[in-house]
Amino acid sequence: MSGLRPAISTFIFLLLITGGVYPLLTTVLGQWWFPWQANGSLIREGDTVRGSALIGQNFTDNGYFQGRPSATAEMPYNPQASGGSNLAVSNPELDKQIAARVAALRAANPDTSTSVPAELVTASASGLDNNITPQAAAWQIPRVAKARNLSVEQLTQLIAKYSQQPLVKYIGQPVVNIVELNLALDKLDE
């Protein structure tokens, strides 16, 4: 019985620290130092939430830039079912999916002569990725320009404006947040 008392007191102590103090402390510090990030990095227009800067959306209209395909269950970009397709590179099903995506992108982008960027036909590990490279966004410019009656130059400048450089210059590559880019496109129409 004497060995049980230290075990119980250690359990209660660790329960209070890891189940109470630590979560409360990280929540308070997160809200204090990083309130936007701690609340989901929500993009708002007035009182309306238009999306999150962290989660992609399923843009299918020709007037919008499209992000990476989503492999989430039930519906594209479902944040409650985050995950990749888990298909191996050697899996024939993955080849079929990629071929179908390439064909769909070619059909939607007939004015683009270069090859389809790989990131536009392969899902990310989370299935929720909202970033693509500026080159993948630029590949879609002819379609978006035609659908929105905008110039190639306007869209090129918009992509440059919304391109984000990596935190460390030589690690990573520039990316464009598709949700923010498409919301900026909507503002051009206003």
From Swiss-Prot:
Q: List the disulfide bonds.
A: none
Q: Where in the cell is it found?
A: Cell inner membrane
What sections of the protein cross the membrane? Answer: 10-30
Q: Which UniProt keywords are present, listed alphabetically? A: ATP-binding, Cell inner membrane, Cell membrane, Ion transport, Membrane, Nucleotide-binding, Potassium, Potassium transport, Transmembrane, Transmembrane helix, Transport
> How far does the signal peptide extend, from start to end residue?
none
Recorded GO cellular component terms are:
plasma membrane
Membrane topology value: Single-pass membrane protein
An annotated Gene Ontology molecular function: ATP binding
User: Where does the source fall among the domains of life?
Assistant: Bacteria
Q: How does it assemble?
A: The system is composed of three essential subunits: KdpA, KdpB and KdpC.
Q: Which family does it belong to?
A: Belongs to the KdpC family.
Which NCBIfam families does the UniProt record give? kdpC (TIGR00681), PRK00315.1 (NF001454)
As for what it does, the entry says: Part of the high-affinity ATP-driven potassium transport (or Kdp) system, which catalyzes the hydrolysis of ATP coupled with the electrogenic transport of potassium into the cytoplasm. This subunit acts as a catalytic chaperone that increases the ATP-binding affinity of the ATP-hydrolyzing subunit KdpB by the formation of a transient KdpB/KdpC/ATP ternary complex.
Name of the molecule in the record? Potassium-transporting ATPase KdpC subunit
| Designated gene of the protein | kdpC
